[in-house]
């Protein structure tokens, strides 16, 4: 169902005039430097002895996932990695470092162009899930000849397509293609299952180990939804982004995390007050939901190690899984938020951006706690406000009525309602927060998101909010720097929340379009500001210190 990498709009580094053969050590180092190295340390002292021993096995299993994913990206990846490792020259070392950052010889930030000679100029659209010369037309013609079962296998998450002398093509299960690695990974999961004290973790690890060998992930996806343990692990084939041909095939990834109990308690507190917030939303009372449904679970964790599809390029900051529609229908989905990753992004990207865009007097009010609390409130806000609505006498949904505009409007709504919620809880005396920190951090964070550009839902939604705040006098631009007008920002937040909620509640596609056409624009003052932050690192490059200390890596 997706992941949030806080991907941001950046200038493409590699132009068509520079070939992989011509890239120098300095150029490769500059490309790598777009990712700021940062140590990730996690406190494991509160884990039981059994869980601590299990954690070591899970770190080792995570590294096996990397080996599988390299094979999924390109058939020549393992041989190329070995060749690069043997090249001890400065150029060879620079290529190897950037290879591991991208998990292959194509640069994620540069339209998947090659930075190593002797490989396809661009990453194959079908990765290694299909024959490299397969066309869409060939695949579509073949699947028309298949039975319902055969079609399910061909288009399924967990098979690769190979040529077959008799039938033209065939679907081969992951359990067969990556069998050696999956047997190794399953054994490590079973060892961890025996060591842990937690029943839900043990069940997930046992069922996921079986899934690696059977190629049937349903039972273990259900067990993952039920996982409630100090060690929070996600491991297996999930996202389909690397299948650019059809979006069918899932890449293996792993996130080994430690649950953050303090932030989890904060989420429960928010959840306990969601109905009260709903009852006071700034919109016509007839549109409020007198009984909001159960909210999808959200876990706040700290990442020990990630690998495979979750570890290349821009780092994942949150993910929402599983993708199996049967499981989603039965159990819903779960959102996992990686707090220490988000803190690292805040420190290495948002903080330096802020120093370039905020007025000096505003800088002391920049706060990670405000940043992360607003992110939590944003996620909770997706669960309140209009969802099922009635338009012209018929039952429908906000998504169906707003169509292509839904994502941008909903992202803007969640941002603004997150602010409204925190202010509401503060006014009721439920929480204490520093208003100046909240709104100053929101202003600074706007520029982090606006680096997405305006072709993506988060960027469109943020541009809408930003223009609205400027028009209301809540954000002020003086002498090339920005500040918050505290006397106006609260009212602006409430007014914008009202407008967005009303558009959603009435299914007003025309109204949504007018808002986006009018407000979701790249203002000249914003464009000028973004030019000044172009040199700030795009993202982070985690160094998994705790993982290495617990389970030293042998390469």
Which stretches of residues belong to each language-model region?
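Extended, compositionally biased alpha-helical segments that mediate assembly or anchoring
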Residues: 497, 501-555
């Amino acid at each position: 169902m997706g992941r949030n990498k806080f991907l941001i709009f950046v200038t493409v580094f590699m132009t068509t005039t520079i070939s992989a053969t011509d890239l120098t050590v300095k150029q490769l180092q500059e490309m790598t430097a777009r990712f700021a190295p940062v140590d990730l340390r996690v406190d494991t002292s509160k884990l039981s002895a059994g869980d601590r021993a299990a954690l070591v096995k899970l770190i080792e299993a995570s590294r096996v996932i990397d080996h599988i994913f390299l094979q999924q990206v390109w058939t020549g990846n393992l041989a190329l990695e070995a060749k690069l490792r043997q090249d001890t020259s400065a150029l060879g070392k620079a290529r190897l470092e950037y290879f591991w950052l991208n998990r292959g010889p194509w640069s994620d930030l540069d339209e998947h162009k090659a930075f190593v000679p002797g490989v396809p100029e661009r990453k194959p659209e079908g990765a290694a899930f299909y024959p490299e010369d397969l066309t869409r037309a060939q695949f579509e013609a073949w699947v028309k000849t298949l039975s319902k079962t055969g079609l399910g296998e061909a288009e399924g998450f967990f098979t690769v397509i190979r040529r077959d002398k008799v039938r033209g093509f065939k679907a081969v299960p992951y359990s067969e293609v990556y069998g050696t690695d999956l047997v190794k990974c399953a054994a490590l999961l079973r060892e961890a299952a025996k060591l842990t004290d937690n029943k839900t973790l043990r069940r997930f690890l046992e069922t996921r180990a079986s899934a690696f060998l059977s190629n049937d992930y349903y039972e273990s996806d259900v067990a993952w939804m039920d996982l409630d343990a100090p060690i929070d692990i996600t491991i297996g084939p999930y996202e389909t982004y690397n299948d650019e041909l059809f979006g069918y095939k899932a890449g293996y990834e792993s996130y080994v995390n430690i649950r953050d109990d303090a932030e989890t308690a904060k989420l429960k507190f928010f959840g306990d007050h969601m109905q009260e917030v709903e009852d006071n939303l700034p919109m016509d009372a007839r549109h409020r939901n007198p009984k909001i449904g159960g909210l999808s679970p959200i876990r706040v964790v700290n990442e020990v190690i990630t690998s495979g599809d979750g570890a290349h390029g821009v780092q994942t900051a949150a993910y929402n899984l599983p993708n199996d529609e049967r499981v989603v229908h039965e159990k819903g989905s779960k959102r996992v938020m990686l707090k220490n990753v988000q803190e690292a992004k805040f420190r290495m990207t948002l903080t330096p951006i802020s120093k370039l865009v905020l007025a000096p007097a505003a800088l002391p009010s920049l706060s990670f706690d405000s940043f992360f609390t607003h992110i939590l409130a944003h996620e909770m806000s997706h669960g309140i406000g209009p969802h099922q609505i009635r338009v012209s006498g018929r039952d429908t949904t906000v998504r169906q009525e707003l169509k292509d505009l839904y994502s941008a409007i909903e992202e803007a709504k969640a941002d603004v309602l997150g602010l409204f919620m925190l202010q509401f809880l503060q006014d009721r005396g439920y929480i204490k927060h520093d208003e100046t920190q909240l709104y100053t951090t929101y202003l600074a964070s706007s520029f982090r998101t606006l680096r997405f550009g305006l072709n993506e839902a988060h960027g469109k939604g943020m541009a809408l909010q930003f223009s609205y705040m400027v028009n209301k006098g809540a954000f002020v631009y003086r002498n090339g720097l920005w500040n918050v007008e505290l006397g106006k920002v609260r009212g602006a937040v409430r007014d914008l929340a009202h407008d967005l909620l009303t558009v959603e509640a009435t299914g007003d596609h025309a109204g949504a379009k007018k808002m986006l056409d009018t407000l979701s624009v790249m203002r000249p003052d914003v464009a000028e500001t973004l030019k000044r932050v172009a040199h700030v690192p795009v993202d982070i490059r985690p160094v998994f210190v705790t993982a290495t200390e617990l389970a030293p890596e042998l390469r």
